[in-house]
Amino acid sequence: MKNQLYYTKPAKCFEQALPLGNGRLGIMTYGNLRHERLSLNEDSLWSGYPKDQNKADAHKYLAACREAIFAKDYAKAKDILNRDMHGHWSEAYLPLGNLRIDYDRAYKKNYSRTLDLRTGVAVTRADGLTQTVFVSHPAQLVVGHIESDRPFSATCRLDSLLQSTVTAQDGTLLLTGQAPEVCMPPYYTQGETVVQGSRGMRFCAGLRADGQVTCTGDSLRIENRKEVTLLLSMATSYVDFRSMPTADEKARMLAYFDGAADYPTLLAAHIADFSALMDRVTLELEGGDDSLPTDVRLKRMQKDKSDQSLIALLFQYGRYLTVSGSRPGTNAMTLQGIWNEQVRAPWSSSYTTNINTEMNYWPTDAVGLGECFTPLVDFAEKLAANGSSTAKAYFDADGWCACHNSDIWGATYPAGFPDGDGDSSCYAVWFMSGAWILNQLYTHSLYQKDPAFDEKLKGMFAGALAFFHSSMTAHNGQPVTCPSISPENTFTDNGQRSAVTYMPSMDREILHDFMENCRALGLDAPVIDQVAPAPDGRVPEWAENYQETEVEHRHVSHLYCIYPSHRVQSDALQAAAKQSLLKRGFGGTGWSLGWKVCLWARLGDGENALRLIENQLRPINPKALIRVRGGGSYPNLLDAHPPFQIDGNFGVTAGIAEMLIGGALPKCWSGKVTGLVTPDGTVSYAFKNGKRVE
């Protein structure tokens, strides 16, 4: 069972189901051999259409907002921002629908279901019947194969939570529908939260089967067969982020069926494609029983911490999710990767660019999957194109910028409560995500060593540099960002609680790296001094000595300088970062735990990194409500915020890679790693009791 997720019961909910994907198509398979469900996603299916939701006159209020901040009238500054300087919510990543396979009887005896991370194949077995499912990147199809030692019968249906119809046509079961024009996040409850309209994206899914089947009405019937292959195709009318979604979704969908090979050929091509990526990196950690079901191992890990091979499985799972969720030509992964079953998913399953989107791509280069980084580059190009409108509207500035939330249409404005009917100041008022993503692209370039990519990068950096040249303001004789925040955190100053301030440490650290990267690309950029340790021995979070309101806050934004920054910091700053981390604690959301694994690993402390990995392997009940601490893992090893957010899976994978590359190994680790990547080459070695074996 090495590098496999294994269970002895069908899934009852999303957090127990198994994810499969090819970057564009994502499914969750439940493994119920009486009433099987495959939930379906297509990565371009979003609500909305291209529209400018910047507040064109927001810059008229900028001077008054800055004056209030510098005068420490935080209430006034917040009111101005909420009323006059926000945009609208970004749009939502949507579920396409479900494929349901209702077998004529239940298959339960000797039940098992597995997901092979090396091959990207899910297999469910019981009572002589085997159901195999994978999502082929070469064929761009979902493939299901059912075989049994005696004849079986089943009825297949398609359905969707979106406006849709199901018909049968020429042996194909068709699901056609349209996404809404507007889909508000679930925490917004005022007025109409889902607006259907007629301008939203259209979608189409088609199901076919080989051999003799009956496809009429709203179902496809399989009768007395010992073997059948199902092919499922999906497509949308999405064109690009600038254009109305008017492509022919049905023609696109049907085209994927053209020339589809037989099942053995489809399977062989899929495994060759998938395993070629997965085989680049191996990790063995001694200790643990791979023959046990994964959910059992997860529970046991909390008792004795001895199942180190479960950590290796978690590491490879992050790589697996990258291969399944992000390929060249697809869209960047969202808060849930490409897997979402809800119309109004938590935080709209969109792009949160004050940590989460970036974290999705932290491990990609180091774990040998550099080509899977491409969608983040494409996403950055969207932001650079749209961000000039935001720079002009909010600062009357040149260049481009982007804020904390985006979508497939490349939203760059400060997303939040429209019309000032709520307080969005602790997350929306942050114009630094474009620079952060560019810094991440620069780090990627160190691996790629591609002059053409560097030239593309230089153009995007030049635009963002122009924004900072014309948007920063002087305070106490220094250029500062204002207004700004330390993402989602608050402070107290003179009895006033606020998020809004100027030049928080994260801004300074991002700009320090950004300007150095500009100069490395041949651009003339000023020097921004790095943050310095505070008198209390920690890295300060803000420009002034404010009082913390939440000492163990989930964001560790002020430690950007340690990780994900690729630059080596001074001994003094590293020592201060350790004190900051100790004060922050060892809890938090799932993605927060992953970030702290990366930080402790970068600081060379494998024991504290391991402590956080163990916390991330804390079993979480799928019924757990949304909360901002108490993260862990669901039975299917997907990251629990809770709720599910995929970024934590990538954060912990990046952290484990950092531990192995930097030699920050805990004493209990013995094993072997091969194929990890640095800008200077590959890393492969054996280790025993936390020490490298030459």
Segments the model singles out, each with a brief description of its role:
Residues M1-S425, T443-S445, Q478-P479, E516, ...:
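Aromatic-residue-lined binding/catalytic grooves and analogous aromatic/hydrophobic interfacial grooves
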Residues K76, L310, C372, A452-K456, ...:
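Alpha-helical positions within canonical tetratricopeptide repeat
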Residues K305, W347-Y351, T364, D421-M432, ...:
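Alpha-helix capping and helix-loop boundary segments enriched in small/acidic/polar residues
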Residues G318, F461, L511, P564, ...:
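Hydrophobic, well-ordered secondary-structure elements that form the walls
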Residues I355-D365, W430-Y442, M506-E516, H555-H566, ...:
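Well-ordered alpha-helical segments within folded domains of soluble proteins
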Residues Q440-Q448, A452-F453, A462-A474, P526-T549, ...:
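Non-catalytic carbohydrate-binding regions of carbohydrate-active enzymes
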Residues G463, F467-R519:
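Acidic/histidine-rich catalytic neighborhood
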